[in-house]
């Protein structure tokens, strides 16, 4: 409903975020996009390795953006990736990330050096070998957090959702200041 309310005649795409690795309502979003003839570009910076019913969240929409920053569950220390379904769009992105060059003598548009350097690419290849172990370790930490926090008044959190393979990249908690006895910000500054 909020997405539909925000659509104007100038809208060309919906850009939802899989925040904290928690998948959006991808079917609902796609239904709205189809109704209005819009593209769907997902911000999947937090969602590497996340699946819904065995299907990667990267398979939904027209494009997904990934961050490979050092703070992510899978990283190359810096950089990222685009997952694009449309071959024509992929080709254009390939040109733009290579200074706009479409060949040795043809420049199609102003571009950037958007390629991952060799060191980060090698680091990423090595990290792919252990990303499943990293996710499994993060899952165990999330289980301990839940066991510890489940009975604390005023503290709530996301539970695992059946059919979703999480990456446990983050463990956000929600603070009810009245029940907990202090606000989220007060707790944050106390724990610093």
Identify the residue ranges that each predicted region occupies.
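Active-site phosphate-binding strand-loop segment of PLP-dependent enzymes
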Residues: 2-76, 81-83, 88
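PLP-dependent aminotransferase class I/II
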Residues: 1, 5, 13-17, 22, ...
